[in-house]
Structure formats: C-alpha cells, structure tokens
A protein has these predicted regions:
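Hydrophobic alpha-helical transmembrane segments
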Residues: 2-8, 183-191, 211-222, 283-288, ...
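Hydrophobic alpha-helical transmembrane segments in multi-pass membrane proteins
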Residues: 3, 7, 36, 41-57, ...
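Membrane-interface helix/helix-cap signal primarily in integral membrane proteins
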Residues: 61-239
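Alpha-helix C-terminal capping segments
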Residues: 75-78, 198-205, 259-262, 347-355, ...
C-alpha cells in the first residue's frame, strides 16, 4: 500500500514538471514523453498504466497554477502605483540592512477598483524600531513582477515557489488600526502575540548568544554576522542555522516523555498540536517545519485510529499537500532539501542501523547524501562537512532541547531561567569554537561548476531504488532482468528530457 501511494504521488510530481517544462519544449514533446512513460510502465515494469492518470492530474494542476500566475502578471495595476493594505506575515533584513516584509494583501486600490488576495514581498526604505509581524499596514508602491536576472537565476520562479506574487519597494509604511471581527484579523492577532513574546524572550538573552539562539531555534540569521554565516557554510554546517524537522522531532520527543512520565497517554495531544502550531509561526512558516508538523499530525491520527504509522506514507502525503497548496514549491530549495533529507532517512538509515557504528554513520549520511544536490545547486562540496557535522550536531542535539524548553517555559509563565540561559550561552559559544576550528581548513571545500540537475536526479533515483525493498524483491530475489531494462530506459528518458 505504501509503495502504491508513494508511486502515485511520484507520478503527480512528474505531471507537474512535464506541464511546467512544456512551455519550453512544446506540448508535442510533452505528450511524447508521457507516451514513453506509459510504454515503459506497461512493457518493462509491469506497472498499471492507470498510474499515468496521476501524471495527467499533475499536468492539469500545474496548468491551473501557471494560468493563475499569468493572470496575476497581467493585472491592470502591475508596474503602476497603487494603494495596498494587508497583514505582515514575516519579516527579515536584506543584504543592505533594509527591512523586508511579506504581506498578505487583501486590498489593492487602483483607478477606483479594488483587487484582493495577493502576496507581496516589500522592501522598505524606512527602518522600524519594532516588529511589524501581525500588523495591518498600508503603503503606496508599484507592484512589479520579478524578472530573471542576468546571472541566470530565475527569481520569478523563486518567489512563486514561496507563494509570492509581486515584489515592491516603498518609502513609507503606515500601520492601520483594524476594527471589527474578521478571521484574518484573529489569525494575525495570534501571530502578533507569539512574535511579541519571541522578541521579549530574545531581549532577555545575552547579546553574544542572541544571534546563535535566533538562528538555531527560530531560523533567523539577521543577528548573525555575515562572516560567521560564511564560516558555517564553508564547513557544511550552515543547516544548523535554519529550522528543520529536527526541531519538531525534539518537541515531539520532549512532549511524549512528559506524557509517559505522568501517565497522560494520548489525551493531551491537543497541547502538542498547539505547540507545533506556535512553532510554525516562530519559524516564519518554514517549509521544512510545515512538512515535519504534517508528519507528526499524521502520526497522531494513526495512533488515534490504531493504525500502523508508516514514515514513507507520511512523507508522501505531506509532499502531496505541499504541492497541492503551491505547485511551484517544487522549485523551492527548502522543500527540495527537506524532502530529500527525509528520503535519505527512509531508504538509507534502515541499512545503517544494521551496522555497528550506526550513530556516527547516521550523522555522516546526510552531508554525504546531499553532496550531489549541493554540487548542482550551490557549486560546491564540503569535505570538512563529513567531519564537522559529527561534533556540531552532537552539541546542537543538546542545545535545541534546552532552547525550545526555555522558550516555552517563558511563553506560558514569562519566567526566564538564568540557569538555562547560562547553558544556552555556554553551548552556543562551544559550538562556534568547534565549528571555527574546522573552518581553518581552507581546502575542505571543493568548488565544482556543474549545474546539470539530470545527473543528480538519476543518481538519487538509482540510490533509492537499490536501497529499497522493491529492488530486493523484484530484481535480486526474482532475477527479473526486464525490470533492470525498464529502469535503464527511465534513466535515458530523464537525460533526454
């Protein structure tokens, strides 16, 4: 059952990509590739060709998304000054130190007409002394569709992957006092309250430790110097400065230990769901956090229904929900890294757990497994990452539980534990020292210019197939050479595409 669901969602993904790239290759080429897939399924892999219906559904869903963005790109107010009103969902700082806000616009007033339901990325030339997250604002600016830059990076697709329709620059932002009852107001009032509590907590931490805590626990790098971030990138440990499924796993582990200790069972799972919802807000709706929360929710549902929880099925459903919500998110680096890491855990970790040095190999598996992706996406591969991740992740596995626990204590009681604060500072400083010592090895990072993603896709496909139970049942046990030919043809098709 789990293999069928995962394969159905894989075909849905193929449909999304076929439709997106049909813009460049043409509809005829897309239909040819679809026909090739049908033939391979039928003649070589003995797979029900009804799975190709999921490919067609994926094509239709991506087409709807493409037409929606095309409509947004041709709205009458594009590249013209308009009055915009909406709520700020997240905030950050660009490389020039200017505040950047993502705003959910519910009113765009242009030529006496009102348009709504768009998401805008705003760069403000006016610096604020306080957070605007959760505030209803008004600004006057030109809403532009992002163009592809000269360096070849498709920033328009990048913003679409984040669910952002337009980018804009404004000189002044006015805060509005929203009156009346609206669901959107209630939602952003909650977001504002959580964000205010987060900022109050950060103000209690010592300045030297504040940047690390904000980066490691909340995924915000604004308080960390660019030199320090570059050091973590050079050692291949920059992932600790971004929130991930590790954080959600730790919250789940702490909660389950407490419920087991006090014999509460599953009766208080709503508290866990509330904590996870709060953390999604704290992490600025990070894709990796949303993915991990979806998996935990599926685990809770499985326990309630007394069903066996399967990690691959949960990943597949979480992936499908992400793609249905925004088909363009397939091009988001955060989503790609998040689900690729999850697949490595599903397919590779069971083999590692049979070895003697399982804990060490599990830490090393992810930086090695993500090597091909890092080469294609970032043009580098860190040799030091294999060594540096072991002590750094060990320290982070201590730091994150202390940090999350101290924050939630403060959230419910406004009590800041000086003991936990001291541990946060000490472990954070030790983590930096250890990472800095590895960064001294300047030759630990290889610069590799290779941007053809087809080879990386083929490599990961081969690794996951060989490490799967399907490989042993179909190919090894039954010596089915026809299946091997089918997989070779799929590889050739990927290269042709």
């Amino acid at each position: 059952m789990r293999r069928k669901l995962a394969f159905a969602i894989l075909n849905f993904l193929i449909g999304l990509l076929l439709m997106y790239f049909s813009i460049d290759y043409g509809v005829v080429s897309t239909l040819v590739y679809l026909g090739i897939i049908v033939l391979i399924y039928k003649l070589f892999l003995d797979i029900d060709i009804r799975y190709c219906l999921f490919v067609i559904v994926g094509c239709i869903w991506m087409l709807i998304s493409i037409l929606g963005h095309y409509n947004a790109e041709n709205m009458p107010f594009v590249s013209k000054e308009a009055i915009c009103r909406g709520y700020v969902s997240t905030e950050s700082v660009d490389k020039f130190g200017l505040p950047v806000y993502v705003c959910e616009i519910d009113e765009i007033i242009f030529n006496g007409m009102t348009y709504n339901n768009y998401k805008v990325r705003i760069t403000s030339k006016e610096k604020q002394n306080f957070s605007l997250v959760g505030e209803r604002i008004e600004f006057r600016a030109k809403l532009d569709v992002q163009e592809v830059r000269d360096d070849g990076i498709d920033y328009r697709r990048y913003l679409y992957g984040k669910g952002i329709d337009y980018s804009s620059t404004c000189r002044r932002i006015k805060i509005l006092r929203d009156r009346g009852f609206k669901l959107s107001k209630v939602r952003f009032d909650i977001i504002k309250a959580i964000n205010t509590k987060k900022n109050l907590f950060l103000s209690r931490i010592s300045p030297s430790a504040r940047g690390y805590f904000s980066g490691i626990i909340f995924g915000e790098k604004n308080l960390i110097s660019s030199d320090v971030i570059e050091e973590f990138q050079d050692t291949g440990t920059a992932h600790i400065l971004a929130v991930s499924g590790l954080h959600i796993g730790i919250i789940y582990m702490i909660f389950k230990k407490l419920t087991t200790r006090f014999n509460l069972g599953n009766r208080v799972d709503f508290v866990l769901i509330l904590m996870l919802g709060i953390y999604i807000v704290l992490a600025s709706f990070s894709i990796s956090i949303v993915r991990a929360v979806l998996i935990i929710l599926l685990k809770i549902i499985a326990d309630k229904l007394m069903m066996r929880f399967d990690f691959l099925t949960a990943i597949s459903i979480a992936f499908l929900i992400s793609l249905i919500n925004n088909p363009y998110s397939i091009f988001d680096v955060g989503l790609q890294l998040s689900f690729l890491s999850a697949l490595i855990i599903v397919f590779i970790f069971p083999h590692i757990r049979r070895t003697r040095h399982r804990k060490l190999l599990e830490i090393m598996a992810l930086p090695i497994g993500l090597g091909a992706y890092n080469i294609v996406s970032f043009g580098q591969f860190s040799l030091i990452a294999v060594l540096a991740n072991t002590p750094v992740i060990l320290l982070i596995s201590i730091y994150v539980p202390i940090g999350i626990t101290s924050f939630f204590i403060y959230l419910v009681s406004s009590h800041y534990s000086s003991i936990l604060g001291y541990l946060i500072s000490a472990i954070g400083e030790l983590t930096y020292t250890v990472n800095h010592s590895f960064s001294l090895f300047q030759k630990g990072t290889l610069e590799i210019e290779y941007s053809d993603s087809r080879l990386a896709i083929l490599l990961y496909t081969f690794i996951f197939i060989v490490s799967s139970e399907y490989f042993y049942v179909k190919l090894v046990s039954r010596h089915d050479l026809k299946q091997c030919v089918g997989f070779i043809l799929i590889g050739i098709t990927i290269f042709m595409f």
